[in-house]
C-alpha cells in the first residue's frame, strides 16, 4: 500500500538544540484516557528553550487538531519572517493536503522521523512525559469532565511556559528566559 505523501528527510537527526527561537519546532500528538473519555494534545515545541509555541486540545486526533495548532504557530512567526524546520513523526496528520499546504504557504521546512523510530522526536516525547508525570498521573480524574480536563491541560501548558523553571535555562521558565535575553515582550 502506498503512502499518503512522500516523507521528507529527517533534517534534525536527533539534534534538538537551537541557538535562537523559531529555528526548529517539534510536534506530535499524545492521548489522555480519563473516565469521561479520550483527550488529545497537539503542541508545537521550540527547540531553543522548550517553549510550547502553540497547542490545540480536543477529543479527536484529526486534521483539525493539528491544523489549528499549526495555524497558531505560524501566526507567531509571520511578523518576523521566521521559517523554522517543523519536525514530526510520520503520522498521517502531517502528510495530508491541509497540513502540507499550510507548511508550503508559510514557507516552513518539513522534517520527519524515520519510520517507527520514536527517539527521532525524543524532545517532544520528553515534554509529553513531563506533562503526564506532573499533571496527569498524580491526580484522580474520576469526577472530571472532558471540558474540565481540557482546561487543566491548557492551564498546565501556560504555567509551563510562564513559570516552570528549567535547569537548562538557568532556573528560568521559557518566557522568563526569553525576557532575560530581551527577545520576549
Annotate the PLM regions.
Residues 1-185:
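Charged DNA-binding/catalytic regions of mobile-element recombinases
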Amino acid at each position: 500500500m502506498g503512502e499518503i505523501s512522500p516523507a521528507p528527510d529527517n533534517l534534525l537527526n536527533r539534534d534538538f538544540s537551537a541557538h535562537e527561537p523559531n529555528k526548529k519546532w517539534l510536534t506530535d500528538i499524545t492521548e489522555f484516557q480519563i473516565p469521561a473519555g479520550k483527550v488529545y494534545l497537539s503542541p508545537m515545541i521550540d527547540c531553543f528553550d522548550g517553549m510550547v509555541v502553540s497547542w490545540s486540545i480536543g477529543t479527536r486526533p484529526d486534521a483539525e487538531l493539528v491544523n489549528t495548532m499549526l495555524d497558531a504557530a505560524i501566526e507567531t512567526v509571520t511578523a518576523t519572517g521566521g521559517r523554522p524546520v517543523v519536525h514530526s513523526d510520520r503520522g498521517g496528520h502531517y502528510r495530508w493536503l491541509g497540513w502540507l499546504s499550510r507548511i508550503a504557504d508559510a514557507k516552513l521546512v518539513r522534517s520527519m522521523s524515520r519510520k517507527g523510530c520514536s527517539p527521532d522526536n525524543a524532545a517532544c516525547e520528553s515534554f509529553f512525559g513531563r506533562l503526564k508525570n506532573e499533571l496527569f498521573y498524580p491526580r484522580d480524574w474520576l469526577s472530571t469532565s472532558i471540558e474540565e480536563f481540557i482546561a487543566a491541560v491548557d492551564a498546565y501548558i501556560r504555567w509551563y511556559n510562564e513559570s516552570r523553571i528549567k535547569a537548562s535555562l538557568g532556573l528560568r521558565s521559557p518566557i522568563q528566559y526569553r525576557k532575560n535575553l530581551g527577545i520576549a515582550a
